[in-house]
Amino acid sequence: MDSRLYWIWLQQALPAGSHAVGELLDTFGHARAVYEATAEQLRKAEIGDDVCRMLSDKSLDTAYRILNRVLELGDWVLTPEDALYPLSLRHMTGCPAALYARGVMPDLDSIPSVAVVGTRSASREGWREAFALSAGLAAGGM
């Protein structure tokens, strides 16, 4: 089975930026091992009851749909086990379990980068400001 499915499953199971990703990887080593962990093994990892509940749904259906769509579009899924996954993210406690990209993949560790992060329920003004900031950064070569 394509190991990216387990990374996508993990990403979908936990909130963005969850510190549990790093803790789980420190304990289990790989997303597949997290997926295969029993409820008891997850509890012993001391990640909290909420995270254990989030990881109790072992369905890979959503992960399959996401991966198939990404591949249909000719896009990329990068996971911490991929050589192109940025080292700067790999060693973050709340590292993303999966990154999605389109086009030619540069060496992301060798170029300056900026992340624009915000709430999922941003105001209209917040969206405009984030768009303007991102457009300005892109126009400036970031």
Question: Which residues fall in each region the model found?
Answer:
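Short, positively charged patches
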Residues: 1-135, 139
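A short helix-loop-beta submotif of the ANL/AMP-binding
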Residues: 142
